[in-house]
Amino acid sequence: MTYKNILDKLVGKWIHQRTSYFIHNQQIDYHQEEIKLKQIDNIYISTKDNNSLYQYELSNKINNQKIYYIFSKQEESEFGKLHKITNDEIKYYRFTIHTHNCIKIESVRENISYNEYIYLINNRFKITISILKRGQKYLATSFISEIKIFN
């Protein structure tokens, strides 16, 4: 599966269930929501040759929040860049196609590392596992399951 094919499979309306476990206080958080990811073309960014650029908008029906994602990758590079844009901040990540059906997203800042694995089980089901660590010590983990809905 190619870079573009994997990103295309993320687009759509999803029922999103997240369970997060915070190790230091043994707290478990759970929530469910309906989200929609669509590809957009209205963000202006100049591109260089041999650089693939894909822009997405993630919207949450409940709180009307919108998050923008910009994926960029040079053709010859194994890694790509991911920018997550919200109302008050921009976060920077790098990503790679980890396996034929998995995207790995990672970020390191001040000895804290974030790793996220998005597994595309099939066209209607995906699982995401996220891990937050300080050095070699685990801080939190998260499990997300998403089912694509059509209506």
Swiss-Prot record:
EC number: 4.-.-.-
A single MF term (Gene Ontology): lyase activity
Organism of origin: Gracilaria tenuistipitata var. liui
Domain of life: Eukaryota
Protein family according to the UniProt entry: Belongs to the CpcS/CpeS biliprotein lyase family.
Keywords: Chloroplast, Lyase, Plastid
Keyword Plastid: yes
Species classification: Eukaryota, Rhodophyta, Florideophyceae, Rhodymeniophycidae, Gracilariales
GO cellular component: chloroplast
Localisation per UniProt entry: Plastid, Chloroplast
EC top class named in words: lyase
Protein name as it appears in the record: Chromophore lyase CpcS/CpeS homolog
Job description of the protein: Might function to covalently attach a chromophore to Cys residue(s) of phycobiliproteins.
